[in-house]
């Protein structure tokens, strides 16, 4: 079993956190000590316990290694915008060494760390750099989450090409049905199965947020065991 991997999305709002929770559930069912890491998150809120991001809160709740919030999400930005815009507005410089130190600490405390990105693969964290540069530095294998909707085929193939161009391995992909009315669902899945350079880890059906529990049954982890 690999000790850490990165969850990338074909876009923002494609269900990275939903897929991450499902994967964490599946890893928990295997008896592994799991940690979740959301290095950078925008659109956070301060509800009296410091600035926290809802996605990071959800991930922290599902992973079974108990961690302080700051260990899960070192950079929680308030503005609901691209991280580079939010960081500049808040006079924050996202330091890759901080991200790397946090990841190393979580590796020591767990069997496997799920690292969830922000937005799409090439999301900027400053005017000059993207989060993908840090993922390259860490040489993290990637699981790609595809939000199944019109246009997702091009987004998925282009994202996969970019990840591979960056010299990283895609170890699997997850289909997340973000729109119950999407037509030609089966045909879209078949094309992705044919074109993606990695195995499908699972398909997550569309469901209201209140029913998003025990989702590990939708994930098959064989690819992560290599």
From Swiss-Prot:
Q: Where in the cell is it found?
A: Cytoplasm
User: SUPFAM superfamilies of this UniProt entry?
Assistant: P-loop containing nucleoside triphosphate hydrolases (SSF52540)
Leading EC class: ligase
Pathway(s) annotated for this protein in UniProt: Cofactor biosynthesis; biotin biosynthesis; biotin from 7,8-diaminononanoate: step 1/2
Cofactor(s) for this UniProt protein? Mg(2+)
- From the UniProt record, give one GO term of the biological process aspect: biotin biosynthetic process
Catalytic activity annotated for this protein? (7R,8S)-7,8-diammoniononanoate + CO2 + ATP = (4R,5S)-dethiobiotin + ADP + phosphate + 3 H(+)
What broad class describes the main subcellular location of this protein? cytoplasm
Gene Ontology molecular function, alphabetical: ATP binding; dethiobiotin synthase activity; magnesium ion binding
* Active site (catalytic residues): 38
**Sequence positions that bind Mg(2+):** 17, 55, 116
A GO CC annotation recorded here is: cytosol
* Stated family: Belongs to the dethiobiotin synthetase family.
What job does the chain carry out?
Catalyzes a mechanistically unusual reaction, the ATP-dependent insertion of CO2 between the N7 and N8 nitrogen atoms of 7,8-diaminopelargonic acid (DAPA, also called 7,8-diammoniononanoate) to form a ureido ring.
Q: What is this protein called?
A: ATP-dependent dethiobiotin synthetase BioD
The species this protein belongs to is Aliivibrio fischeri (strain ATCC 700601 / ES114) (Vibrio fischeri)
